[in-house]
Amino acid sequence: MIKTIAIVVVVLLVVSLAGVLLLAVSKPDTFRVQRTTSVKAPPDRIFPLIADFHGWSAWSPYEKLDPAMKRTFSGADKGKGAVYEWDSDGKAGKGRMEITDAPAPSKVTIKLDFFKPFESHNTAEFKLEPRGDTTELTWAMYGPNLFIGKVMGIFFDMDKMIGKDFETGLANLKTLAEQKPIDATTSRR
């Protein structure tokens, strides 16, 4: 009787594992998370807040994950070539961002590398499109959907998880940009 139960349990585990693996391989090879908001400010008021990593602490939800994380800035002061690295024992992990393209005031493209808690290499992109007296501001992240990401996608809705952070960040940017005109350097720590 115990032998039969053990066999049934093993078979159920194998079938469950096979099901998870089949679901994982059926997931797309790339991912994209994107959120958009409308900001009552011109692109040239929003752009400096994004193109200068020193000012991200004023609006990025990721900056609040671990106030004690180590931050390093290198490369250009802002815009193309600016580099921001972080190292955290907490939720923020360890990673690096480098602005690879920043045609003012329409777009900022960032090479985004995570090293901890898992390694991944993606692209983050901010687009600023004037729409009359407002700016349509889009924050996107995209890249390869590796096998571990496909498996995680079965159990967690990554779009909702990351998208919620993007919505918070965009709302913070909107609030900052709709205030009096500011210079991103005034918000530096």
Please provide the spans of the model-predicted regions.
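Generic structural detector for well-ordered beta-strands
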Residues: 36-40, 85-87, 98, 109-111, ...
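N-terminal post-signal-peptidase region of extra-cytosolic proteins
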Residues: 70, 81-84, 110-113, 123-124
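Extracytoplasmic/periplasmic/luminal assembly and interaction segments
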Residues: 52-101, 151-152
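Sec/Tat-exported extracytoplasmic proteins
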Residues: 50-60, 88, 166, 170, ...
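Beta-strand/loop substructures that line and gate deep hydrophobic ligand-binding cavities in soluble
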Residues: 4, 101, 111-167, 173-175
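Hydrophobic ligand-binding cavity/cleft-lining segments
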Residues: 4-76
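Short, surface-exposed coil-to-beta transition loops
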Residues: 32-34, 92-97, 119-125
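Short, highly charged C-terminal tails/helix-capping segments
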Residues: 71, 174-189
